[in-house]
Every structure is written in C-alpha cells, then in structure tokens.
C-alpha cells in the first residue's frame, strides 16, 4: 500500500531543495568570479535582496487566495516576483560591466516592466490556453483561488448579481469545468 506516489512525495520537495542548492552555487560562483571586491559585494547583496523579494511575492500570492486583493496589492506582489528575477539578472550584468548608478536605475525600471509583462502573459495563458497549448489544465489558477491581474480587474468591474456569482465561484473549492468556463467569459 502506497499512501502517496513518488512524485507527490519527492517532486515539490526536491524542486525546492534543488533551487536552494542552485542559489547557493550561484553565490559561490559570484564570490569566486575574480571581479573587483566592491562589484562582487554589490552583486551578492542584489542576489540576497531579490531572493528575499521573490519569496515574499510567493507568500503574498498564496495569501491572496484567501483574501480580497486590490490592484495595489497585486502591484506590490508582482514587483517582487518575475520583476525581481529579471532585475537580478539585468543588474548583475550591469554592475559587473561597470554601469553607472543612473544606468542601473533605468535598467531596474526596464526589468520591472519585463517582469510585469511576463506575469500578466503567464496568467492570461494559464487562464485561457488549452491544456495542449499550456501543458497544464486550463484555468488551474482559478481552480485554486489565485487572483491574477485580470481577475482583480474583473472583480472591480462587475456589479450586483454578477459580482456575487463571480466571487462565489472564485471562492469555491474545486469549481467545475463549466463554472471555470463561466468565470473565463467575464
């Protein structure tokens, strides 16, 4: 008798451990890269800060499943998610290449916009693409109560009975395919 399958037991845990190992490996590579000490320190601090931001964003994303979420809430969360990853990558290159503080600030804004674009695109694909196109069941985020930007906007735009129905279905555990489809049409 198996209480759980191998993937369920080791899949997510292994992924988290592998990510932690890769993160520490990246810090090791940077620390031994041979760049000037000041640049290495700046990049290490950047990695630490953006790693913290990504984890904060994931925590916020989970909490949003259980709370009403505003556009401001989403912006805070999204500014720390993919935007942090793009910022870390772009800033690392800029710092090591000797970019000025002004250039780094401009690149940070670019990274934030790229990150927002990535998150919005990923959420739209996750909601509307077929399983064949996306590799996951369509509407999976809706099914678990996530609140991507387009759902937050929909909640702000709907009124009366439609708002109540929409919100009720979003809060429902395991909505049916028909209910998910109804949410998609709003």
Tell me what each language-model feature is.
Residues 1-163:
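Mg2+-dependent prenyl diphosphate-binding active-site environment of isoprenoid biosynthetic enzymes
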């Amino acid at each position: 008798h198996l209480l759980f399958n191998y993937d369920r037991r080791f899949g997510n845990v292994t992924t988290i451990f592998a990510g932690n190992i890769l993160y520490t490996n990246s810090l090791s590579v940077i620390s031994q890269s041979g760049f000037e000490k000041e640049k290495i320190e700046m990049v290490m601090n950047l990695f630490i800060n953006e790693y913290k931001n990504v984890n904060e964003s994931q925590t916020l994303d989970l909490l949003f499943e259980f709370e009403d979420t505003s556009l401001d809430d989403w912006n805070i969360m999204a500014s720390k998610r993919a935007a942090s990853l793009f910022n870390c990558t772009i800033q690392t290159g800029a710092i090591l290449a000797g970019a000025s503080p002004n250039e780094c600030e401009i690149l940070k804004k670019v990274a934030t916009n790229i990150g927002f674009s990535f998150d919005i695109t990923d959420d739209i694909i996750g909601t509307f693409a077929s399983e064949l196109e996306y590799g996951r069941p369509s509407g999976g985020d809706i099914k678990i109560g996530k609140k991507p930007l387009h759902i937050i906007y929909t909640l702000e735009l709907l009124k009366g009975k439609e708002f109540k129905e929409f919100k009720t279905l979003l809060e429902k555990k395991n909505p049916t395919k028909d209910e998910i489809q109804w949410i998609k049409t709003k």
